[in-house]
């Protein structure tokens, strides 16, 4: 059985959104904040965690990330708002 994985969304210092996946959100966030994450976020510090979503496996989280990245910024924010209000 595979471990749980997460799709996460960061808000960058320039207001842009970054989407990724990981098995440990807090450790990954610390890497991004330390400038050791993705090249995209290194150039746009500071970053804050805007949203995280649990998935049953890494492939499921990767699939969710790919689908999320296809959305417009407005659709991404609406998706996050809808899920965080119902939590």
Curated annotation (Swiss-Prot):
InterPro entries: GIY-YIG_endonuc (IPR000305), GIY-YIG_endonuc_sf (IPR035901), UPF0213_domain (IPR050190). PROSITE patterns: GIY_YIG. Residues 3-78 form the GIY-YIG domain. Gene3D superfamilies: GIY-YIG endonuclease. It holds the Pfam family GIY-YIG. SUPFAM superfamilies: GIY-YIG endonuclease. It comes from the Bacteria. Belongs to the UPF0213 family. This is UPF0213 protein SSA_0709. It comes from Streptococcus sanguinis (strain SK36). The lineage of its organism: Bacteria, Bacillati, Bacillota, Bacilli, Lactobacillales.
């Amino acid at each position: 059985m595979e471990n749980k994985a997460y799709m996460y969304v960061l808000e960058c210092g320039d207001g842009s959104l970054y989407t990724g996946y990981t098995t440990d959100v807090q450790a990954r966030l610390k890497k991004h904040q330390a400038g050791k994450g993705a090249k995209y976020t290194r150039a746009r510090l500071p970053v804050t965690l805007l949203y995280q979503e649990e998935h049953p496996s890494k492939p499921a989280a990767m699939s969710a990330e790919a689908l999320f990245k296809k959305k417009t910024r407005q659709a991404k924010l609406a998706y996050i708002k809808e899920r965080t209000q119902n939590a």
